[in-house]
Design a protein with these regions (language model features):
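A general structural detector for well-ordered alpha-helical segments in enzyme core domains, enriched
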Residues: 22, 47-50, 70, 74, ...
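Radical SAM [4Fe-4S] cluster-binding motif and immediate context
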Residues: 162, 166-317, 321
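Proline-aspartate-enriched helix->loop->beta-strand connector
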Residues: 55-56, 224, 351-352
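N-terminal [4Fe-4S]-dependent radical SAM core
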Residues: 1-3, 138, 142-185, 562, ...
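Short N-terminal binding/cap micro-motifs at the start of the first secondary-structure element
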Residues: 12-18
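A structural motif corresponding to the C-terminal lobe/cap of the Radical SAM core domain
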Residues: 238, 256-265, 269-430
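Radical SAM enzyme core and accessory elements
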Residues: 2-8, 27, 44, 51, ...
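Glycine-rich beta-alpha loop elements in corrinoid/cobalamin-binding modules
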Residues: 2, 18, 25, 34-157
Length: 612
């Protein structure tokens, strides 16, 4: 008997931990399952063609909000052309409405609810030995037999997680090299957040700590790029997570570990670890969701804003750990103005990424039954909220566009320097939300939401926005970010980076020919040919006010002030940027004469030669 277990991942870089757990547990009971993964971006007929060539007797799919509709469509076609295949579905989208699913979709034969390792293995054994998987009842298995739906609707748990083997093999490492590897050290959550499926039970179970460390070492030995923990609250038990974090810091190699952490549970110990680990070793995701107390009470969530303000900034300031923070649009009592405050609160902490999500009325979540908040939501997965009692649809729509613009520019981290400068002024005075809302309105006025823009188009939009704001420093820093983030590959007149680099070379010629001067900035430099200069370096002029945001103190030797050009009203500096993204400032020559550059006298560059 051939058993295939599958899922439709949302992206190619994703992989399914659930399927690998099923396969690993099945081996302990002498059951063999073959894993086949697809993505929701693949043509459904291509998936159908592949599935039907596998000649499966039992076919299982893991179902989530991103794939349930496509999975059901696929299963209806599979059943039509291969009616003998027994189809079983599992996953969060099945676990809370299993009977309804079987009633509405005759193509589905069985469902497994909850944690499926034990239940699915018992199901396969029953089918293989010719017995009914629903009579006698297998906890967690509901099915259709003789036209009747019968069995268990219970969402089961695996009580002893130590019975579940490590899910990855040497063979997996050959196929998952460029994908995110998912992992867990615990199941469950101690909190009761009503928007989340994990808020139903308030219990946490742990995998043995020594085993977890051994498995993390295995990932490091295999040079896994990123291990993403799916623990709902990684730092809920110090006796468990502190030794794991210390191990990551001390032995994590080049592997990056992604952890979801609860800020109100953070102690100085966690802050110290996250502030002293190797840069890029650990990244954390902190779900604040809202800073509005009435909202937090309604969703049964505890936040301590004072605590958040005390533990998050030191981690960010240390610069070792990437900090990602979350907000949710559409929570009870959170109008647009209240959301603006929550946004500004989190923005003031300057996380590396501030993700804006939209409330989803998940099956099995408490918020799905909260009629008093007058939710209007999409009836199809992912059940996203369209309107609430205090947030009309027009505001939701605007916030959707806001999120898109903010994600493209601030969260992309391609423009760190310019947004570092902007953030500083917005935190001191003004509203970050209002600033990005103004940017969003210009985006919509130009119809960009309906266009497919390349990187140069998006940079040109930012440059125009900064220009309309009259912000020369932002324009200068944007050009700097473009050169460093894109290695000089994107140049466009629309944002002041000409593709014709002759003028750039002419402005800087005397600098490059004065080897002793250049060596103050570039060790072991010697002039060879202009082609090498053009290949390895780019130069831009910036206003004096931009220098502090490039880490260059004004008035220093490296950035000696020069007289303004005739066509410019502000003092300018020339910055060298090499292809590695390092910044090297130098004096731009201005006047002719046999001057000594070390004395900051200004000399002019002769006309550029044809060799440029």
């Amino acid at each position: 008997m051939k058993v295939i277990i599958s899922t439709l991942n949302s992206k190619y870089i994703h992989s399914s931990l659930a399927l690998r757990y099923l396969q690993a547990y099945g081996r302990t009971k002498d059951e063999a399952y073959e894993i086949v993964e697809y993505t929701i971006n693949m043509p459904i007929l291509d998936i159908l063609n592949n599935v039907t060539t596998l000649e499966a007797d039992v076919l299982g799919f893991a179902c989530y909000i991103w794939n349930i509709d496509m999975t059901l469509h696929l299963c209806s076609m599979i059943k039509a052309v291969r009616p003998s295949i027994k189809i079983i579905l599992g996953g969060p989208e099945v676990s809370y409405t299993a009977r309804e699913l079987l009633e509405d979709h005759p193509c589905i034969d069985y469902s497994v609810q909850g944690e499926a390792e034990e239940a699915f293995t018992s199901f396969v054994k029953a089918i293989r030995t010719g017995h009914s998987p629903v009579d006698p009842v297998i906890p967690g298995i509901l099915g259709r037999e003789q036209g009747n739906i019968q069995g268990s609707e219970e969402a089961v748990e695996v009580k002893d997680l130590s019975t579940i083997p490590f899910p990855y093999t040497e063979e997996d490492m050959l196929t998952l090299g460029n994908k995110i590897v998912y992992y867990e050290s615990s199941r469950g959550c101690p909190f009761s957040c009503q928007y989340c499926l994990s808020g139903n039970r308030n219990t946490v179970r742990f995998f043995p700590q020594e085993r977890v460390i051994e498995e993390l070492a295995w990932f490091v030995e295999h040079n896994v790029k990123q291990v993403k923990f799916v623990d709902r609250t990684f730092n809920c038990a110090p006796h468990h997570h502190i030794p794991l974090m210390e191990w990551m810091r001390d032995h994590g190699g080049q592997t990056n570990f992604h952890l979801e952490m609860e800020s109100i549970l953070m102690t100085e110990k966690e802050v110290d670890i996250l502030s002293s680990t190797r840069h890029g070793q650990i990244q954390i995701e902190v779900g604040v969701q809202s800073t509005h107390n009435k909202t937090l009470e309604a969703i049964h969530r505890r936040n301590d804003w004072g605590r958040i303000q005390s533990v998050i900034p030191p981690i960010i300031k240390a610069g070792r750990t990437h900090v990602h923070m979350d907000l949710i649009v559409g929570l009870p009592y959170e109008s647009k103005s209240i959301f603006e405050k929550s946004f500004n609160d989190l923005f003031s902490l300057q996380p590396h990424a501030l993700q804006i999500g939209f409330l989803k009325l998940l099956k099995g979540s408490g918020v799905r039954s909260m009629a008093e908040y007058e939710y209007i939501a999409n009836l199809k997965a992912p059940y996203e909220v369209l309107q609430t009692h205090v947030l009309p649809y027009d505001d939701v729509r605007m916030l959707k566009h806001f999120e898109d613009v903010f994600e493209r520019f601030y969260n992309s981290e391609r423009y760190r320097t310019v947004f570092g400068y902007i953030s500083e002024s917005l935190i001191q005075e003004g509203s970050a939300f209002a600033y990005f809302e103004e940017m969003t309105k210009l985006w919509l006025e130009k119809g960009n939401q309906e266009r497919k823009l390349n990187d140069a188009d998006q940079i040109a939009f930012l440059y125009e926005f900064f220009t309309l704001k009259g912000d020369q420093v932002a324009c200068d820093l944007l050009r700097y970010d473009v050169l460093t983030s894109f290695n000089g590959k994107i140049r466009d007149e629309r944002f002041g980076l000409s593709k014709d680099r002759k003028q750039e070379m002419q402005d800087a010629e005397i600098f490059w020919r004065e080897e002793s001067l250049v060596q103050q900035y570039i060790r072991n430099y010697s002039f060879v040919e202009w082609r090498r200069i053009r290949q390895d370096y780019h130069t831009i002029e910036v206003s004096g006010n931009a220098l502090p945001y490039l880490g260059i103190p004004r008035g220093s030797y490296d950035t000696a002030e020069i007289a303004p050009s005739k066509d410019k009203e502000y003092v300018t500096y020339v910055i060298i940027i090499d292809v590695k993204g390092e910044t090297k400032p130098f004096i731009r020559p201005q006047q002719c004469g046999d001057a000594n550059l070390n004395n900051r006298e200004h000399i002019a560059s002769p006309s550029i030669r044809e060799e440029v």
